[in-house]
A protein has these predicted regions:
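Primarily membrane-embedded glycan-assembly and transfer machineries that use lipid-linked glycans
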Residues: 2, 9-203, 227-348, 401, ...
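Aromatic-enriched
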Residues: 52-58, 361-450, 454
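Juxtamembrane/interfacial segments around transmembrane helices
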Residues: 90-101, 211-217, 265-268, 285-296, ...
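Short alpha-helical "patches" and their helix-cap loops
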Residues: 124-130, 208-209, 237-240, 261, ...
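Membrane-embedded alpha-helical segments of multi-pass membrane proteins
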Residues: 129-134, 181-189, 210-216, 237, ...
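Transmembrane alpha-helices and membrane-interface helical segments
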Residues: 137, 141, 188-199, 224-228, ...
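Transmembrane helices and adjacent periplasmic/lumenal helix-loop junctions
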Residues: 207-224, 342-353
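Short amphipathic alpha-helical segments
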Residues: 333, 337, 348, 352, ...
Length: 454
């Protein structure tokens, strides 16, 4: 712990954050001492949230009165995709006229296949509950890495505190649940692999498996590369290839269409250019150049793609900086947000990574004040129902106060993500080596122990 004089030298925001974190630490200590009971209670709370979502989305307000035209819209279409495959119908259409088409590799069909064995309500209830359990798994993995918690305490905190609060308060998580999205099923095992798996024979395998279901997680191989864990890189690529090959053997026609036509013909991106929902709601830097005052002209599109590549590179550089400071959770957040805003399509539910912020704040404290401020800005953007102010019909064309509100709502997630990435790149003051030698961080000690055990 730092002494009073050290705390007095800190900016007010940092002192307030430290005081809040200390109080939270005391509360979580009680949860850790009653881990089993808290885990059971937390699982029950998540079951109630899943039941509420299954019954009330979209007929009543879900998070700040954010109504949805159809509950679990994306999940309903994915289950229908599986039913089409079961009777030999088309999975990948040549003309992409709507957003509701299958965007994943054929291996992802297995994620949705069990939902065809039950009724719609049961499927939505089970899917939502499983999503919340995956959210708890993600949070528990981050807690173990950042706070050196034992698994019982990590799961207790995640089930009783982290996952319920995230679902009820954070907009990206709420949107994810209301649409029946798949992201948490992929993020949880990937985070566990990146932060907790230390056995060199297994490290990287789960990242590769998730990348076979959706190509996006392959970006996390950069995490292993930055740490020069080359065996983990090959494990990830090998497991991705193995799952893809298995899916190719089961779905040869669909696999050929996806990898040789859908990914190569450019239609996956071009069809968005005239889609009002994407233009108004995507938080990608590429999408910015299709909004007022831009028109999506060829030069503007080229600039957008360059900026997307720059955002991904910025995320990698920020992750490298934080890994050099031994802040693994912070580095993962940088990679995730860089890849998100650097993707040509970035929906609100892509920003579920906000659940990592508390652990970035406590990992190897103290965090530099400018980084703390950037993280709080990102959290603030994730608390506001931005989708309600984006003018999805694109009907407002005037340059007035309303335009500024719309502009802010459309770009808040991207801007605050970039602010964090820039803040993470700015070097922080090196810790006092004598202080570190006398009082080693618990997280560092646990990390060394875990590596030795692995």
């Amino acid at each position: 712990m730092r002494d009073a004089s050290t705390r007095a030298d800190e900016p007010p925001l940092a002192r307030a954050t430290d005081a809040s974190l200390d109080a939270l630490h005391r509360g979580l200590g009680w949860v850790g001492r009653h881990a089993l009971g808290c885990s059971i209670a937390g699982a029950g709370v998540l079951a109630l949230i899943a039941w509420y979502a299954a019954w009330h989305v979209p007929s009543s307000g879900w998070l700040f009165l954010s109504h949805y035209a159809v509950g679990f819209k994306d999940l309903v279409y994915r289950v229908q995709n599986v039913r089409n495959v079961q009777v030999g119908r088309t999975l990948y259409y040549a003309q992409l006229g709507t957003l509701q088409y299958f965007v994943y590799p054929p291996a992802a069909l297995w994620l949705f296949w069990p939902l065809t064995w039950v009724g719609r309500f049961t499927g939505e209830l089970l899917w939502t509950y499983a999503s919340l359990i995956c959210l708890a798994w993600l949070i528990a993995s981050a807690g173990r890495a950042a706070c050196a918690w034992r698994w019982p305490k990590a799961w207790a905190v995640a089930l009783l505190v982290g996952a319920p609060l995230s679902a009820l308060v954070l907009q990206p998580v709420g949107v994810h649940l209301a649409l029946g999205q798949v992201g948490l099923f992929l993020a949880a095992p990937a985070v566990f692999d990146l932060l907790c798996v230390r056995d060199r024979r297994l490290r990287g395998v789960l990242v590769g498996v998730t990348a076979a279901f959706k190509l996006y997680p392959i970006v996390y191989v950069a995490f292993f590369a930055l740490r020069r864990e080359w065996r983990a890189v090959w494990n990830a690529l090998g497991s991705m290839a193995a799952v893809t090959a298995l899916a190719w053997a089961v779905f040869p026609g669909y696999s050929e269409t996806f990898f040789f036509h859908r990914l190569l013909n450019g239609g996956e991106l071009r069809h968005y250019w005239r889609n009002d929902h994407w233009i108004s709601s995507s938080s990608s830097l590429y999408t910015v150049f299709f909004r007022q005052p831009f028109t999506g002209s060829p030069p503007e599109r080229a600039v957008g793609l360059v900026l997307c590549a720059a955002a991904v590179l910025l995320g990698v550089l920020a992750a490298r900086r934080l890994l050099a400071e031994r802040r693994e959770v912070g580095a993962l957040l940088c990679l995730a947000l860089g890849a998100t805003v650097g993707s040509p399509v970035a929906w609100d539910h892509y920003f579920i990574w906000v659940v990592l912020v508390p652990f970035v704040l406590v990992e190897r404290r103290p965090l530099a004040w400018w980084r703390t401020a950037a993280l709080w800005l990102f959290v603030l953007a994730c608390l506001v129902p931005l989708r309600l102010a984006r003018n999805e019909s694109l009907s407002h064309r005037a340059y007035d106060g309303t335009f500024l509100v719309i502009l802010t709502a459309r770009n808040a997630l991207a801007v605050t993500s970039l602010v964090w990435l820039v803040a993470a790149c700015v070097p922080a003051r090196a810790p006092d080596p004598d202080g570190d030698r006398d009082q080693p961080r618990a997280a560092t000690v646990a990390s060394h122990q875990a590596r030795s055990a692995g």
